[in-house]
């Protein structure tokens, strides 16, 4: 029954919101439509022969198909999932994971940066500071949030509140989901590179636990500005890279259509980054991706946050800073090809 309701909701979403169906998802959606039609038929007629048995077979086939497809996604496919318009954003996770969240505004230099959302909240009754990118769901929100690409004011606001968290001994949890820092001329004039560098320099020295989670896109300096922490987590189908596949293809081959080749070369998936010791943990998503089940994705992330926060709280401030510095200093070690 739950599967029937899930399929029905998915079909209604497709019709109502015209959600994006990714190329590798088309067979999955076609099979879901077939199951939905058979379920509707079974409700109309009580005696339809072996229709119940057929539905059961198709449900098993659907589960296997989802598992096979999502277990073998390449870099570009993962990028498309990470950018999926229905993928849960920071505010969705706040709703499911935290309580008593209160958004604070302003960088105290005349700006706010709405691409960054930040404020205190409670995580299982523990006061924490939550900071993250917010892309926006519809076009109006996306424009207001600048598609998750923050101006310097957003990063300065984030730093102000992280320093507040340090003052009150509150752990910091950041949610990373951005194509990158806003690259406009006005952002550069306002000190974009300085704002990012100052955040990184300051976060490495903060004497409270910091957990960073890549929930969608982790784009270059825009991600690093709130991505220096004791533990770096990535959702299974998120990506983390110095540049987008399109940008990489345009620079290396002067052909943005070589995005698949670029995505593979960038090694931007969670599995790659765990292997390279850039991140510490992969948080598995519900079968079919987090965009299919926001609540279940949040439950899994909450469990991972609870485990990591419990471990970090046992470490003293001096040791936290020392371990964090060592963690980032050893990144990017040169190795011989083939070793």
Residue spans of the language-model regions?
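Conserved catalytic cores of soluble enzyme domains
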Residues: 176-306, 310, 314
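Terminal peptide-recognition signature
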Residues: 31, 74, 130, 177, ...
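Glycine-rich beta-alpha loop segments
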Residues: 71, 100, 110-112, 118, ...
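Short, conserved glycine- and acidic-residue-centered signature motifs
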Residues: 7, 151-154, 266
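Short hinge/gating elements
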Residues: 79-82, 143-147, 288-291
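Intrinsically disordered, low-complexity segments enriched in small/flexible residues
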Residues: 16-127, 295-339
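Single conserved hydrophobic/aromatic residue that forms the stacking wall/gate
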Residues: 1-15
């Amino acid at each position: 029954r739950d599967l029937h309701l899930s399929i029905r909701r998915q079909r209604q979403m497709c019709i109502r919101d015209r959600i994006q169906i990714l190329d590798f998802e088309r067979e999955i959606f076609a099979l879901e439509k077939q199951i939905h039609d058979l379920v509707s038929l079974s409700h109309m007629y009580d005696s339809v022969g072996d229709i119940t048995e057929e539905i059961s077979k198709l449900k098993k086939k659907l589960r296997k198909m989802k598992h096979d497809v999502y277990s073998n996604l390449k870099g570009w496919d993962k990028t498309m999932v990470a950018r999926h318009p229905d993928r849960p954003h920071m505010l969705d996770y706040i709703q499911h994971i935290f309580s008593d969240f209160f958004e604070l505004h302003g960088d105290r230099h005349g700006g706010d940066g709405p691409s960054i959302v930040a404020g205190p909240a409670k995580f299982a009754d523990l006061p924490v500071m939550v900071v993250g990118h917010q892309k926006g769901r519809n076009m109006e929100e996306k424009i207001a949030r600048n598609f998750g690409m923050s101006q310097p004011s957003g990063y300065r606001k984030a730093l102000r509140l992280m320093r507040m968290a340090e003052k009150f001994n509150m752990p910091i949890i950041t949610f990373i989901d951005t194509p990158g820092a806003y690259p406009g001329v006005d952002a550069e004039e306002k000190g974009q590179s300085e704002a990012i560098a100052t955040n990184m320099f300051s976060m490495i020295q903060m004497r409270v636990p910091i957990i960073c989670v890549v929930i969608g896109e982790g784009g270059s300096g825009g991600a690093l500005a709130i991505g220096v922490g004791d533990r770096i987590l990535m959702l299974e189908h998120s990506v983390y890279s110095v540049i987008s596949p399109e940008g990489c293809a345009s620079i290396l081959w002067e052909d943005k259509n070589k995005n698949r080749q670029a995505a593979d070369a960038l090694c931007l998936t969670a599995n790659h980054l765990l292997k390279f010791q850039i991140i510490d943990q992969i948080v598995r998503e519900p079968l079919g991706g987090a965009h299919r089940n926001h609540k279940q994705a949040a439950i899994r992330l909450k469990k991972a946050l609870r485990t990591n926060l419990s471990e970090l709280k046992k470490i003293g401030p001096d040791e936290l800073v020392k371990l964090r510095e060592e963690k980032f200093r050893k990144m990017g070690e040169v190795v011989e090809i083939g070793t």
